[in-house]
């Protein structure tokens, strides 16, 4: 039932789509004024980016909040690049899903794999990453499971460590897989424009 309700929300949204550089960009405008923008790989339909934007109390549009995809460093000028150089040793957290798993990558974590503990906190509905040396702690939610009103399961969680990057995977429940499949069918019905990025509302 929960899957259907989230799908209905997506179906009821006003959608525009743009195809560019091998990516399908979809912009959703919901009845409550919220906006969601997604980017998919045109060939594989793999989700590359998902971000949200809401209006503030005064009705002005806020900044896009990234849910899936690689964060773009703020500040494009020389000052921005200097700031990036200064902070490039800090852990960088990002989400990049696969077809069958939600996946998060935390870069710049040099400790061996046995130092990390990754677990589900049922009451808080989040995943917690800890290190036995107390050098790193991170708590994050899985918005997809919240939207579908599905429980978090420890058994769906796994992690690996390589090249100073901790890779955390959570196997997508069958309900989410089914909803994503239905959404792809729905998106094929949306009239898709071809053109420059400036044509798309989400840019």
Curated annotation (Swiss-Prot):
One of its GO terms (biological process) is spermatogenesis. One of its GO terms (cellular component) is extracellular region. InterPro entries: DPCD. It comes from the Eukaryota. Belongs to the DPCD family. May play a role in the formation or function of ciliated cells. This is Protein DPCD. The lineage of its organism: Eukaryota, Metazoa, Chordata, Craniata, Vertebrata.
């Amino acid at each position: 039932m929960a899957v259907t309700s989230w799908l209905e929300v997506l179906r009821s949204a006003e959608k525009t789509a743009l195809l560019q550089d091998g990516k399908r960009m979809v912009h959703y405008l919901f009845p409550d004024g919220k906006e969601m923008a997604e980017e998919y790989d045109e060939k594989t339909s793999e989700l590359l980016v998902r971000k949200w934007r809401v209006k503030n109390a005064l009705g002005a549009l806020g900044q896009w909040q990234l849910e899936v995809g690689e964060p773009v460093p703020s500040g494009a000028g020389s000052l921005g690049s200097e700031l990036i150089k200064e902070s490039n040793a800090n852990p960088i957290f990002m989400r990049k899903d696969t077809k069958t798993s939600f996946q998060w990558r935390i870069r710049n974590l040099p400790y061996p794999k046995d130092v990390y503990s990754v677990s589900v906190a049922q009451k808080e509905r989040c995943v917690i990453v800890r290190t036995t040396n107390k050098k790193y702690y991170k708590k994050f939610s899985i918005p997809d499971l919240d939207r579908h009103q599905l429980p978090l399961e420890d058994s769906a969680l796994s992690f690996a460590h390589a090249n100073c990057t901790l890779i955390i995977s959570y196997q997508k429940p069958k309900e989410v897989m089914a909803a994503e499949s239905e959404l792809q069918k729905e998106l094929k019905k949306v009239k898709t424009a071809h053109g420059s990025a400036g044509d798309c509302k989400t840019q």
